[in-house]
């Protein structure tokens, strides 16, 4: 994220910052939240709306596939991509791993766009069912989310991802523009239903607001509200939340993010 400068550069106003935060304000979920994956890093809260989900796409694997393993117990296949490792951390017949980086361009054998990675899956052609996107790619989520088509996004029922570099994005005029563009795009199809700060890193206090450097975000596609007909108000922190690093205290999401 160095191209965005630092929080000491030109800076953004408190009004601009608080306006941007409204794009991440959690809304009531049409389904109760459940936790899938480990008790620490690798576990996430998502809506309990998995019937009819046929696959999960997971850019960024590293050494954890606990979330994807939990999905296999529900018969959901996971497609994984990570060029930094040679194989999935655990073996499972419902895992499909490729040594690839997800990017905004294609280079055979190393880089592929998110749209093309998904379109390439013969197992999903001609069939119905929704998808999940679970993404933890160390800051590359921003260009990828800007690049992905609305057609591909609309195939995801649930998105759970880690946002990196928020301390730079939300305090820098260029960065906050990227943030607003990406979440305006996402909010056209999805609603944020949960936030959890990753305690791997400290928060930055800027304009009176504590900004986690890494934030877990859960979204659900807006058409799922009409299917459910119910609403479950956001509870943050949630009793199902767990610190990513067990021996460090949780980072709290302040009311600035919730109001």
Which positions does each model-derived feature cover?
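Phosphate/nucleotide-binding beta-alpha loop and adjacent structural elements of enzyme active sites
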Residues: 1-259
């Amino acid at each position: 994220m160095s191209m965005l400068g630092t929080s000491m550069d030109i800076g953004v106003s408190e009004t601009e910052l608080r306006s941007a935060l409204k794009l991440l304000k959690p809304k009531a979920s049409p389904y109760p939240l459940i936790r899938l994956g480990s008790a620490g890093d690798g576990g996430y809260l998502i809506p309990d709306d998995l019937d009819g989900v046929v696959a999960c796409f997971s850019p960024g694997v590293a050494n954890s596939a606990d979330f994807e393993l939990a999905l296999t117990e529900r018969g959901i296949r996971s497609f994984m991509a990570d060029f930094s490792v040679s194989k999935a951390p655990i073996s499972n017949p419902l895992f499909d791993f490729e040594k690839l980086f997800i990017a905004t361009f294609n280079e055979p054998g190393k880089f592929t766009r998110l749209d093309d990675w998904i379109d390439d899956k013969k197992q999903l052609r001609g069939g119905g069912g929704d998808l999940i996107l679970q993404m933890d790619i160390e800051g590359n989520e921003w260009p990828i989310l800007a690049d992905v088509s609305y057609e591909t996004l609309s195939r995801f029922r649930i998105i759970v991802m880690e946002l990196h570099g928020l301390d730079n994005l939300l305090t820098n005029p260029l960065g906050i523009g990227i943030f607003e563009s990406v979440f305006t795009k996402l909010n056209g199809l999805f609603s944020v239903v949960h936030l959890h700060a990753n305690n791997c890193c400290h928060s930055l206090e800027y304009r009176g607001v504590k900004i986690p450097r890494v934030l877990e975000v859960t979204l659900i596609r807006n058409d799922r509200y009409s299917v459910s007909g119910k609403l479950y108000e956001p509870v943050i922190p949630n009793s199902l939340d767990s610190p990513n690093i067990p021996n460090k205290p949780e980072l709290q999401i302040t009311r600035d993010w919730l109001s």
